[in-house]
Design a protein with these regions (language model features):
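Conserved beta strand-loop-helix elements of the APE1-like EEP
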Residues: 1
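C-terminal target-recognition/interaction regions appended to catalytic cores
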Residues: 20-193
Length: 193
């Protein structure tokens, strides 16, 4: 059975998918902490910029960094952006850019659910990996995995490999309201014989 917290996470993203325009492009992954953020990320990083200059920007979910002390500023920037590096790798720049662009293009729809996403607290629950390109934005007949990298949604019938199916990442079947049994996973992957 799913925990109340994971049920809240699932319901939040289910509602999010219901609220966004059906024809919009959903980047994969979607990092919701970038909704409203303005801190620099293309040519520099928050760490390289320093707290004095960083105060001029907005952190995760558009939080104004000006109101925070030097020690509080970095806790209001997403964890993945706190790295002590001068420049982010291109893949990270693209993910941040795509998430911010999605928010800019869909702000009216996203703002209807944003507070619920913010209330999820744990950053991994504030990231959505939609691996169902071209399908309707609906969670019910999909396979959900709660991962450190985010809430991963896959097509029904696409089960993660056994290697990645540790206890913390067991696939959840929303339409059956239960986790997949280990034996089912073995059978799907042809190891039941």
């Amino acid at each position: 059975k799913i925990t109340p917290l994971k049920n809240e996470v699932l319901n939040t993203w289910k509602y999010f998918l219901k609220k966004i325009p059906k024809d919009c492009y959903l980047p994969n992954p979607l990092w919701a902490m970038e909704f409203g953020a303005t801190y620099p990320f293309k040519e520099t990083t928050p760490h390289a910029l320093g707290t004095r200059k960083l105060k001029k920007f907005k952190g995760k979910f558009g939080i104004n960094l000006r109101k925070f002390t030097k020690n509080q500023i970095f806790s209001n920037v997403p964890a993945y952006a706190r790295l002590k590096v001068k420049k982010f790798p291109n893949w990270k720049v693209n993910m941040i850019m795509n998430s911010r662009k999605f928010y800019k293009n869909n702000k009216t729809s996203v703002d209807k659910i944003l507070e619920s996403i913010i209330n999820l607290k744990q950053e991994s629950y504030q990231k959505l990996e939609w691996n169902c390109r071209g399908e309707k934005y609906n969670l019910i007949k999909k396979i959900v995995t709660f991962r450190g990298s985010g809430v991963r949604i896959k097509r029904n019938g696409q089960i993660p490999t056994l290697i990645s199916t540790c206890m913390a990442q067991t696939p959840y079947l929303p339409w059956k309201k239960r986790y997949i049994a280990f034996e089912e996973c073995l059978k799907i992957q042809g190891f039941d014989k």
